[in-house]
Amino acid sequence: MTAQQLWQRYLDWLYYDPSLEFYLDISRMGFDDAFVTSMQPKFQHAFAAMAELEAGAIANPDEQRMVGHYWLRDPELAPTPELQTQIRDTLAAIQDFALKVHSGVLRPPTGSRFTDILSIGIGGSALGPQFVSEALRPQAALLQIHFFDNTDPAGFDRVLADLGDRLASTLVIVISKSGGTPETRNGMLEVQSAFAQRGIAFAPQAVAVTGVGSHLDHVAITERWLARFPMEDWVGGRTSELSAVGLLSAALLGIDITAMLAGARQMDALTRHSDLRQNPAALLALSWYWAGNGQGKKDMVILPYKDSLLLFSRYLQQLIMESLGKERDLLGKVVHQGIAVYGNKGSTDQHAYVQQLREGIPNFFATFIEVLEDRQGPSPVVEPGITSGDYLSGLLQGTRAALYENGRESITITVPRVDAQQVGALIALYERAVGLYASLVGINAYHQPGVEAGKKAAAGVLEIQRQIVELLQQGQPLSIAAIADDLGQSEQIETIYKILRHLEANQRGVQLTGDRHNPLSLIASWQR
């Protein structure tokens, strides 16, 4: 295309909403009008399915559940008065709790105010709160936040060391719908141990965000934790940021959660439009479908040109990949769907992997996220008439142009600033785009059987470990092959070897002797 033709295409496909000052540019995606026309029937089906979902239909057929994250920012959409009241009551309880913490009405037993938050959760129970806290945390935050988002002992130690004596003034939020997520349970037990070692009572500083009636809920009631907030079975982890999962920590940090919900609600209204060209989420889904031929054949690279949006790509990685990465479609046919997502931030990435994006394998499309406001207040001049923010903007435009010149497609999202309203809108935009795309390709975006398969496999490994320890404690040194035979686990010999190696490295009673280059020569014995 000539420069004039490209400009005209930009004008033809530019989406702008004045209420949010939000721009979406898909002009650098290579689809034509014929493709758009061919997709219209699919989109009409997707719009109808989305309307049914919002009305309370069973949109997650595998688990026979409603999907209600859109209700969280507009309770009147919920299909029953009871649900509407429940959503409003939870929000009011979060706001009241945060106010009492900030005012000192709720305080740790030491009598001082809470200084820190330790949020324990994994997956959607961590990625959303981490993204929002990084994007929106005030410079003079009312509390500092830390996360246990794994089951890494060294990671636990690092966070606890950072807290130090402030553990006595730390509010611990444990987030788990079932209360049985192993990583979250482990983090809770680790921090309870740290409290006990310091002679601090845990319950007066503990808050549960969990399903009503769950194991964790019962623990919190029995031990008289400071507070409990609900997680609903109609809200999935990856779409839970605007529930108690994300709103509680955000409110405690002093983030305007009312504005965040309002931004999401505004974007929801825009993305209900049944005209494809007037629906920004549909335009995203259209572009994704075009890029990967409806089969996820190209990766999505997220490039936010703003430090505060650093974690947005990680948040989207789960939202998109866990939702769309499915083996089977709704009819049970094997389809192997999904879109791989990665990214960091601009312009840092221009000094990392953008070289490959421009000149390497063309197996991706990029999404640039542009923020118009550089900072609050004036900027110093770094060159005559040029600021650091001008450089950042120029680098974004230059990278976009350089990719297009080499046949690499891209989308550009532009927001006026990074604030609570805009972050809420971005979350809602991608939630809707994922739902629409899932309908286009005929999959269930709201379950995650692959995650459950990994959990079951891990449980099997731990059961083998228990059997190994019991066998070795009988006192007879054994080869790895002999252990496998004795346990009737010959097909798990590699797993047995790796368990033994891990136990020895952590001085857990196992000693291995023999040639490390040849694991079959190793003899395992129990050291009392």
UniProtKB/Swiss-Prot annotation:
The active site is at 322 (proton donor), 351, 455. Pfam families: PGI. Keywords: Cytoplasm, Gluconeogenesis, Glycolysis, Isomerase. GO terms for cellular component: cytosol. It comes from the Bacteria. GO terms for biological process: gluconeogenesis; glucose 6-phosphate metabolic process; glycolytic process. Its EC number is 5.3.1.9. It is found in: Cytoplasm. CDD domains: SIS_PGI_1, SIS_PGI_2. Pathway: Carbohydrate biosynthesis; gluconeogenesis; Carbohydrate degradation; glycolysis; D-glyceraldehyde 3-phosphate and glycerone phosphate from D-glucose: step 2/4. One of its GO terms (molecular function) is glucose-6-phosphate isomerase activity. It catalyses: alpha-D-glucose 6-phosphate = beta-D-fructose 6-phosphate. It is an enzyme of class 5 (isomerase). Its main location: cytoplasm. Belongs to the GPI family. HAMAP family: G6P_isomerase. Catalyzes the reversible isomerization of glucose-6-phosphate to fructose-6-phosphate. This is Glucose-6-phosphate isomerase. It comes from Synechococcus elongatus (strain ATCC 33912 / PCC 7942 / FACHB-805). The lineage of its organism: Bacteria, Bacillati, Cyanobacteriota, Cyanophyceae, Synechococcales. The gene is pgi.
